[in-house]
Regions:
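Arg/Lys-rich, alpha-helical DNA-contact motif
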Residues: 1-23, 32, 46, 51-52, ...
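Minor-groove-contacting beta-hairpin "wing" of winged helix-turn-helix DNA-binding domains
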Residues: 57-64
Length: 110
């Protein structure tokens, strides 16, 4: 799973507009924005790639960060990649990016 769980309880309203991790989008709105179905988004949750936060009523809420990941998966699937393979590719890309970030940070601060 690609982490995106942050505590947003103490975040001001103005900060939420700029926070790419704030779970602002309902499943329906997220699916509409991505041009996909709610079922596709549920499948990403079932694959443990994206685990949206839940509202008090139990409804899924997606962040912009999660929507970018979902859009990348959709792109791979549209190119003929199986969903499970697309999820694995995204996970590996994320791990590579994180490793590169850690190396760059270490090189900057020996």
């Amino acid at each position: 799973m690609i982490p995106d769980q942050r505590d947003t309880a103490g975040t001001s309203a103005a900060d939420k507009f700029d926070d790419e991790h704030y779970p602002a989008y309902t499943m329906g709105r997220a699916a509409e924005m991505l041009g996909t179905s709610a079922g596709f988004l549920r499948s990403l949750d079932e694959a443990n790639l994206i685990q949206p936060q839940r509202s008090a009523g139990g409804h899924r809420r997606y962040s912009r960060y999660q929507l970018r990941i979902a859009a990348r998966v959709r792109e791979l699937v549209d190119q003929g990649t199986a969903l499970d393979a697309a999820c694995r590719i995204i996970t590996l890309e994320d791990q590579l990016h994180e490793a590169q970030r850690v190396i760059a940070e270490r090189d900057d601060h020996p």
